[in-house]
From Swiss-Prot:
Pathway(s): Isoprenoid biosynthesis; isopentenyl diphosphate biosynthesis via DXP pathway; isopentenyl diphosphate from 1-deoxy-D-xylulose 5-phosphate: step 2/6; Isoprenoid biosynthesis; isopentenyl diphosphate biosynthesis via DXP pathway; isopentenyl diphosphate from 1-deoxy-D-xylulose 5-phosphate: step 4/6
Pfam families, alphabetized: IspD, YgbB
Family: In the N-terminal section; belongs to the IspD/TarI cytidylyltransferase family. IspD subfamily.
UniProt protein name: Bifunctional enzyme IspD/IspF
Ribosomal protein among keywords: no
GO BP, one annotated term: terpenoid biosynthetic process
SUPFAM superfamilies in UniProt: IpsF-like, Nucleotide-diphospho-sugar transferases
Organism this protein belongs to: Mesorhizobium japonicum (strain LMG 29417 / CECT 9101 / MAFF 303099) (Mesorhizobium loti (strain MAFF 303099))
A GO molecular function held by the record: metal ion binding
Binding site for a divalent metal cation: D253, H255, H287
Documented EC number(s): 2.7.7.60, 4.6.1.12
Length: 407
């Protein structure tokens, strides 16, 4: 786990509410609600979910959908649907958010991001900026300064005045808040019949919760009109015509046995009559994968980031290393496409624990289980592995980076 995600966990984690219950009349209904329309080969909501599921600082995700959209959501989200909680939203965006916040109550997150499903071009950096700006009793709003000249219309349909754009910003999502205060604000607005707020920063303002502005992104557009869907599809289709920058990294690690009662492999403790010797928990599989991930963006190796001479890593869980490497990859624009680990040992048996290992890696990397492969083989009694003196691991990671392969 990264340092940032460790801090978030200590305060209850960073949850996400994604609002996807709207009917999208302005974008047209010919192809269904806009969050389920196809752009670049997938539904809009699938692009949105991918970003948040992959982000190392986000935790539980709740999606508020329309009562009629169960099958649409299942088809659009695919394997992602198993990793989020879908609830029935309300008749308005405001009520859908309130219901989403209530669905998180038993999990008591420390912070929450609220995002429109129809903003599929949100990026990891914007999410990071928003989370980092959330205070103990202070929200965070990504926004862009208004660039267009603004006119106020009169009742007669003519220009009444030119509005100064000084200090004006266009609000975006995700909007971030400490969980308790924003839930209380939504509940109070509901009880008082104040159902006219158009975003959550407005509710926070009404409830006297300070909201800090953070730089938004020009790419983080909301798909509102039919032409927006067409432009988004064109944008993604155009990006896919380039030869993608797919990079592959390899990692290798080995640890010797010493007296103990279990080994930790790929994040799972396995009972054994020995343990692996190392400065951390000696998870040979995760160490190899950490090197493989870092190799995809030329970011050194595990020893560069977590030197064994540093006492703070003594006995540390190796998931910290993997999640850090995944964050480094994402900060450099990468998207993890696949992770493959081969464990080389005579014992213990890996097969009975493969499913748990895959699930653990899925959580660490923020990718679906079908993009993870964990294999095991013996060394046919040859060498130190064959003599059961230790375990070796080989890992390969594939990462897609933006842009094209340079000539």
């Amino acid at each position: 786990m990264t340092e940032a995600s460790e801090n978030a966990s200590a305060t209850g984690g960073v949850a996400v509410v994604i609002v996807a219950a709207g009917r999208g009349a302005r974008a047209g209904q010919a192809n269904g609600p806009k969050q389920y329309q196809n752009i670049g080969g997938r539904a809009v909501i699938a692009h949105t979910l991918e970003i948040f599921l992959a982000h190392p600082r986000t935790d539980r995700i709740v999606v508020a959908i329309h009562a009629d959209d169960h099958e649409l959501f299942r088809q659009a989200a695919g394997s992602q649907a198993e990793r989020v909680t879908a609830i029935i939203g309300g008749p308005t965006r405001q009520e859908s958010v309130r219901l989403g916040l209530l669905a998180l109550k038993e999990h008591a997150p420390g912070q929450v991001l609220i995002h429109d499903a129809v903003r599929p071009f949100v990026d990891a950096d914007l999410i990071d900026r928003t989370i980092s700006a959330i205070g103990e009793n202070e929200g965070a709003l990504p926004a862009l300064p208004v660039a267009d000249t603004l006119k106020r219309e009169s009742a007669a349909g003519v220009v009444a005045e030119t509005v100064s754009r000084s200090g004006l910003h266009a609000a975006q999502t995700p909007q971030g808040f400490p969980y308790g205060p924003i839930l209380a604000a939504h509940d109070k607005a509901f009880q008082l019949g104040r159902l006219d707020f158009t975003d959550d920063a407005a509710i926070a303002e009404w409830a006297h919760i300070p909201v800090k502005l953070v730089p938004g992104s020009p790419d983080n557009v909301k798909l509102t009109w039919a032409r927006d869907i067409a432009m988004a599809h064109q944008r993604l289709s155009s990006e896919r015509t380039h030869f993608p920058d797919i990079r592959t990294g390899n990692g290798y690690d080995v640890h010797a046995f010493e007296p103990g009662d279990h080994v930790t492999l790929c994040g799972v403790a396995i009972p054994h009559d020995k343990k692996l010797s190392g400065h951390s928990d000696a998870d040979v599989g995760l160490h190899a994968l950490t090197d493989a991930l870092l190799a995809t963006c030329g970011a050194g190796d595990i020893g560069t980031h977590f030197p064994p001479s540093d006492p703070q890593w003594k006995g540390a869980a190796s998931r910290i290393f993997v999640e850090h490497a995944a964050k480094v990859v994402r900060q450099r624009g990468g998207r993890i496409a696949n992770a493959d680990i081969t464990l080389i040992c005579e014992a213990p048996r890996v097969g009975p624990h493969r499913e748990a290992m895959t699930a653990a890696l899925s959580r660490m990397l923020g990718i679906s289980a079908d993009r993870i492969s964990i294999k095991a083989t013996t060394n046919e009694k040859l060498g130190f592995v064959g003599r059961e003196e230790g375990i070796a691991a080989i890992a390969t990671a594939s990462v897609v980076f933006p842009g094209e392969v340079p000539e």
